[in-house]
Amino acid sequence: MFGRLAATAAAPAAPSAARWPAAAARCSAVVFLGAAPVCLFVFLVATLRHHPSDFTTFWDSGRAVLHGRSPYPSPQSLPAHPDPKTFAPFVYPPVAAVAMLPLSLLPFGVAIVVFLLVDLAAVALALRLLGVTDWRCYGAAFCSAPVFASAGVGAISPLLLLGVAAAWRYRDHAVRAGLLVAYVATAKLFLWPVWLWLVRTRRFAAAAVAAGAAVAGVLGAWAAIGFAGLHDYPALLGRLTRLVGPESYSPYALGRSLGLGGTTAQSAAYLAGAAAIALAAWRLSGDRRLLTAALGVSLLMTPILWPHYLVVLYVPIALARRRFSPLWLAPLAFWIDVSGWTSGSPARIAALLALTAATIGMALQRQSGRDELPVEQ
């Protein structure tokens, strides 16, 4: 009798005990994917004005255009040994300087907070355009080093992520897709391989719109500043690559850290990129995988690669898994090294490149055979 009573009393406890793992998982998700991003960005806002940032350069470039001055330094004015804490010359295409005019009208303290909010909104909107609705995916993204680094320095990388995501969403609308690809390629030159995605998927009208809009946009923006800096621009980019390329995380930097000369290291990166383009064109099919390959090639060929560039990896991740999965946690591994310049350390460079390659590889594997997301007409 007592045995039956004991069994009866213990029976209701079994379902309760079984619910503990699920409850613990939900609590962990709320803490690490909900509360942690909020704490990170509260800290960021509190310390925003105490750190030099890319946004300072953008704001100054907009002010220069506003007052009729060139935003570009001369190649000869760049220091032989740049200080990683203060070296941030404006070297973007002039479209970026013209785009910063509205923010340059604001006081710097106001403008930098506005731009931080724009960066965060761009990440959220990009994920939404990619069809992501699971809140845990947003939490994982906002906890990641690439997103935090982008917001922390005031980089335009989240806006590039948004541009690529929108190009995917409107990929079968020639004018919209073309204009969006032109925007990302002219705002940050290393993303030009995204244009090849349009060509490889036979979206020739969109590719033509992108090419025409890119040329018109760059020439129009340069005309707006009186073509200041146009003659020296190639030399400026070359000098910047020689100065800070070896300090970044690019394959070019890895080659330099292993003793290759500048020309040899850059040629090796270009050859590797060309081989990757040929392999992708031959072996891969489907919009998802080809866009992922285009972004991978972009990161492979750029001579300068900073951690915040890697925010574009959320396009392949979202195209592989629209709901939360371990793949969404992969970019958290980039927290192993977010200190900025590498000082030419091959171990640091190789570690970040290996994590990048692994993330792209996992996304490609999980994209295989999936149906395409709906196309916005």
Identify the residue ranges that each predicted region occupies.
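Membrane-embedded alpha-helical segments of transport systems
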Residues: 186-189, 216-220, 326
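Loop-to-transmembrane alpha-helix initiation sites
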Residues: 342-355
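Transmembrane helices and adjacent periplasmic/lumenal helix-loop junctions
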Residues: 181-198, 302-309
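Signature aromatic-anchored transmembrane alpha helix within multi-pass, membrane-resident enzymes
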Residues: 215, 325-337, 352-357, 376
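Primarily membrane-embedded glycan-assembly and transfer machineries that use lipid-linked glycans
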Residues: 2-177, 201-322, 336-338, 342, ...
